[in-house]
Regions:
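Canonical Radical SAM [4Fe-4S] cluster-binding loop centered on the CxxxCxxC motif
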Residues: 1-14
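Short secondary-structure capping/turn micro-motifs that flank functional sites
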Residues: 40-41, 95-96, 122, 150-151
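Short Fe-S-cluster ligation motifs
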Residues: 15-38
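Short helix-terminating capping/connector loops at secondary-structure junctions
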Residues: 26-27, 58-60, 190-193
Length: 195
């Protein structure tokens, strides 16, 4: 949740990890995503939460975390030792180089490491350049999210000239097409085909 220092499990506000575990049991969860704000802003609590969930549910309980902070690479081992399975980096300003050493450390620590970005149609060339740059990074995946127009961002989206792609989705026009284009470039590269 943005700008508040509270823990939630689904939509339930939790004061303790016991409440988080109770919620996970109630929904028969097989894993959990750790989001924010940014979980690194409460690093010790995040590490404790990872450790507690793994201890309670076992090694098969998949834990992934989202962050936009290029944290000290030495922390990667702490997250791996606590039980973090996967980390997804949101690259602020699309400045991948700031994240290189952290990404490498996470991968080397055995954490499945990837990048997750919104496909902003007005940043097409920057995103295609980023895609090329990331070829030299030690990542296992890249998630491309459709840019959504929401109550919280609609004024900014309007200023940037975005419209809804259809009446049945909150996706910005052109975002899905950009994601598919980027995906086809990655697939072509994997097969050593021109993109």
């Amino acid at each position: 949740r943005r700008d508040i220092d509270w823990m939630f499990a689904n939509e339930r506000r939790c004061e303790t990890f016991e409440e988080v575990i109770e919620e996970a049991r109630a929904m028969r969860a097989t894993g959990a995503g750790i989001t924010g704000g940014d979980p690194l802003m409460a690093k010790e609590r995040t590490l404790e939460g990872i450790s507690r969930l793994k201890s309670e549910f076992g090694p098969g309980f998949h834990l992934h975390m989202y962050t936009s902070i290029p944290f000290n690479p030495e922390l990667a081992r702490e997250f791996a030792d606590a039980g973090l399975d996967e980390i997804r980096f949101h690259l602020l300003g699309l400045d991948a180089e700031r994240y290189r050493s952290t990404i490498s450390a996470c991968s080397e620590s055995g954490i499945l490491t990837g990048v997750e970005i919104p496909c902003e149609p007005d940043r097409r060339e920057e995103l295609l350049s980023l895609l090329e740059e990331l070829r030299s990074f030690d990542i296992s995946f890249m998630n491309l999210n459709e840019l959504e127009i929401t109550v919280g961002n609609h004024e900014n989206m309007e200023l940037r000239g975005f419209n809804l792609s259809t009446e049945i989705t909150a996706g910005a026009s052109g975002s899905n097409e950009l994601a598919l284009d980027m995906k086809s470039r990655v697939n072509a590269a994997e097969q050593s085909l021109p993109d």
